[in-house]
Regions:
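Active-site-proximal, substrate-binding regions of enzyme catalytic domains
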Residues: 1-118, 124-154
Length: 154
């Protein structure tokens, strides 16, 4: 099974490598699919945010760099899907100005059989868009959310 992780999963939940995906999704094998748009979203958070989100984005980007560029193995295979070329008509018709739509468009044009793809997100709009387009969807259990660090006052 191919699983597409939305950026909110990568930023707000424990490491994708610590989640028992086979148990969560009731499958034998999992390949993590990273799209160009998700990587851009992570890079933007790494460059523009401050504090915990920036730190988390840097860690996520670094791990994917180790795996995809450095050739290091991870717990799960990772596949990179570059942003697909879209004509002006496709950009308008599929509303590709929305990042979620671009992610789904990229997967559809990657050559993967969408019957083998599950979109994992905590974003209701993303899950609805994916479901409407025929993808399997999965909302990750909150037990995998990163623990909030106590504030200085606590």
């Amino acid at each position: 099974m191919y699983i597409v992780l939305d950026s909110n999963i990568l930023l707000h939940y424990i490491s994708f490598e610590e989640i028992p995906w086979q148990d969560e999704l009731s499958c034998d094998e999992v390949t993590i699919v990273l799209t160009g748009m998700v990587l851009e979203e992570i890079d933007k958070k790494k460059d523009d945010e401050k504090g915990k989100i920036q730190k988390r984005a840097k860690a996520v980007a670094s791990r994917f760099k180790e795996i995809l560029i450095g050739g290091k193995s991870g717990k799960y295979p990772v596949m990179f899907v570059e942003s697909a070329y879209a004509t002006e008509d496709e950009r308008r018709r599929f509303h590709l100005d929305r990042n979620d739509n671009q992610i789904l468009f990229d997967i559809r044009n990657s050559g993967l059989d969408i019957a083998d793809v599950t979109v994992v997100s905590s974003d209701t709009a993303m899950l609805l868009r994916a479901k409407q387009q025929g993808y399997k969807i999965y909302q990750l259990n909150d037990k995998y959310l990163l623990q909030e660090e106590p504030s200085k006052d606590e």
